[in-house]
UniProtKB/Swiss-Prot annotation:
PROSITE patterns reported in the protein's UniProt record: C2_TENSIN, PPASE_TENSIN, TYR_PHOSPHATASE_1, TYR_PHOSPHATASE_2
Name used for this protein in its record: Phosphatidylinositol 3,4,5-trisphosphate 3-phosphatase and dual-specificity protein phosphatase PTEN
EC number: 3.1.3.16, 3.1.3.48, 3.1.3.67, 3.1.3.-
Taxonomic source organism: Dictyostelium discoideum
Composition skew (Polar residues), residue ranges: 410-439, 479-505
Gene: pteN
Length: 533
């Protein structure tokens, strides 16, 4: 029963199911292991039992493993792994501090160089999203991959059956940030920026627009809450034109459908009348709430901006002139929040909620990588990206962040890698049978992973010629595994070695499965916004 629960919890992640083990664990390379949280007591029934993880690592990698915990929400006694534990915590479904990624990679790098047998075992709670973010960054740091998208796709294929590895847009974005810093030899320095305006375009659906709220945090510290600040909020909405088809045919019978259209026409006229009264400083019974009908809750006239009458609603001011005269750009609809001048630096989280504080969407950006006009599409917004049927947000929905003039020189300092750093990168060969190689972004990518047993005495042997190799061919839209093995049930992604050892002291074999119709190819974070930084 416990095994069934573990399989259910791990979902589409690859598991180690051999030699008496059943662990949510997969080899990404010879020396990088991804796994779920090592748990105790009741949680150990449906997650990785701590004792089983300890036994596994002692059996196959005794004295040569270091565990990295990425969970901010839970810890364990480091003595359970002989004190060899690295702790780089950040919240689930969130991005880490950008500096933390580099610190993590340097830690893993130092550990690997102590002994060629050493491995890094990396986990968060589920062992997929946060774990994947850090592993993908490491794959670029050590030179195995140069391209962000390829690194993400490689990890997804080796960690999951459905090729859905890192799926949170903000986490993908941060892999892209780090990849760029590696490729461009950027020494990261947080840049101070001034946020002036946030625009949602087109308008979100199924929500009272007057109830849209948001907060801005630097790291975990909230620095701006729309409920507590006065600001101008401008809503631009299309003017609807209703044609009464009954007037074209006097003999046409009055149907329920036609009757509703007549009512819509009357409501439209009443709405415009209400707005006209509002602009004259009068209150109207129709001005109940700002919603799809284009009305706003009754409030005081607080003046004009650019000829537009402003209305006070809570702590914010709304301009509705566009609603009254249809004076929009084409079919443009948006809601704009004029923040003023908010100074920010580093890792920024912006979260939009409704009046009940239910999350609409959120996203992370880093100020050192943004442009003066940063556009984040729906696919780059956490939670909103799941709205595949566009019920809550239009397909072309996006967020626009307008910053004050940016100091490009302050953005980052470009440095040339020292001879020592160049030597360090050469420690990890660019082409071998346990790493993926790519000659260009669009070329096919071939990854060779043997099903031979892994042994802690040979887990860095890069000259294997085992006859039972499984070949992973990765194209831009599809990843597939092919091998002489045919049993897909116990497939594991364990890279190759040549030494033949008994199963008692060997890690799982790779048994290949063909994976088709990849629908989880990650978007390169450098293009996660409509404008590259």
């Amino acid at each position: 029963m416990s095994n069934l629960l573990r399989v259910a919890v791990s979902k589409q992640k690859r598991r180690y199911q051999k030699n008496g083990y059943d662990l949510d664990l997969a080899y990404i390379t010879d020396n990088i292991v991804a796994m779920g949280f090592p748990s105790e007591k009741v949680e150990g029934v449906f997650r990785n039992p701590m004792k089983d993880v300890q036994r596994f690592l002692d059996q196959y990698h005794k004295d040569h493993f270091k565990v990295y915990n990425l969970c901010s929400e839970r810890v364990y006694d480091h003595s359970k792994f002989y004190g060899r534990v690295g702790y780089y915590p950040f919240d689930d479904h969130n991005a880490p501090q950008f500096e933390m990624i580099d610190a993590f990679c340097r830690d893993v790098d130092a550990w690997m160089k102590e002994d060629s047998k050493n491995i890094a075992v990396i986990h968060c709670k589920a062992g997929k999203g946060r774990t994947g973010l850090m592993i993908c960054c490491w794959l670029m740091y050590c030179g195995m991959w140069k391209n962000t998208e390829d690194s993400l796709r490689f990890y997804a294929a080796l960690r999951t059956y459905n090729q859905k590895g890192v799926t949170i847009p903000s986490q993908i974005r941060y892999v892209g940030y780090f990849g760029r810093s590696i490729r461009e030899s950027i020494k990261y320095v947080p840049r101070n920026v001034t946020l002036k305006k946030i625009v949602l375009r087109p308008l979100p659906k199924e929500i009272n627009l007057s109830e849209v709220q948001f907060n801005i945090s630097v790291g975990k510290n909230c620095v701006f809450n729309s409920k507590e600040h006065n600001m101008n909020v401008v809503i631009s909405k299309k003017k609807k034109t209703v044609v009464d088809k009954n007037k074209k045919d006097p003999k046409k019978k009055l149907t329920k459908e036609n009757s509703e259209k007549n009512i819509d026409s009357q409501q439209q006229q009443q709405s415009q009348s209400s707005l006209s009264q509002s602009q004259q400083g009068q209150s109207s019974p129709n001005m109940q709430s700002l919603s799809a009908s284009g009305t706003i809750s009754s409030g005081s006239n607080v003046g004009t901006v650019n000829g537009n009458t402003l209305h006070q609603l809570g702590g914010s001011q709304f301009s509705l002139s566009d609603l009254a005269d249809g004076n929009t750009i084409g079919n443009d609809e948006y809601i704009s929040f004029e923040i003023g001048a908010l100074s920010l630096a580093g890792d920024i989280r912006i979260e939009f909620t409704n009046k009940q504080d239910d999350r609409m969407f959120m996203f992370w950006v880093n100020t050192s990588f943004v442009q003066q006009l940063e556009i984040i599409p729906k696919s780059g917004l956490d939670k909103a990206h799941k709205d595949k049927n566009h019920k809550a947000f239009p397909e072309d929905f996006h967020v626009e962040l307008t910053f004050d003039q940016l100091d490009q020189q302050q953005s980052h300092t470009t440095v040339v890698a020292s001879a020592e750093e160049q030597t360090n990168n050469q420690h990890y060969p660019q082409s071998s049978n346990n790493v993926a190689t790519s000659s260009s972004h669009h070329d096919n990518i071939t990854v060779v992973a043997s099903d031979a047993p892994q042994n802690n005495n040979n887990n860095n042997n890069l000259n294997s010629s085992n006859s039972n190799n499984a070949t992973t061919t990765t194209t831009k839209n599809n990843i597939s595994l092919a091998s002489s093995q045919s049993n897909p049930v116990q497939q594991e992604s364990n890279p190759s070695t040549t030494t033949q050892v008994s199963e008692e002291n060997s890690a799982p074999k790779v048994e290949a499965e063909k994976i088709e119709n990849s629908n989880a190819s990650a978007n390169d974070s450098e293009t996660s916004s409509n404008s590259s930084s």
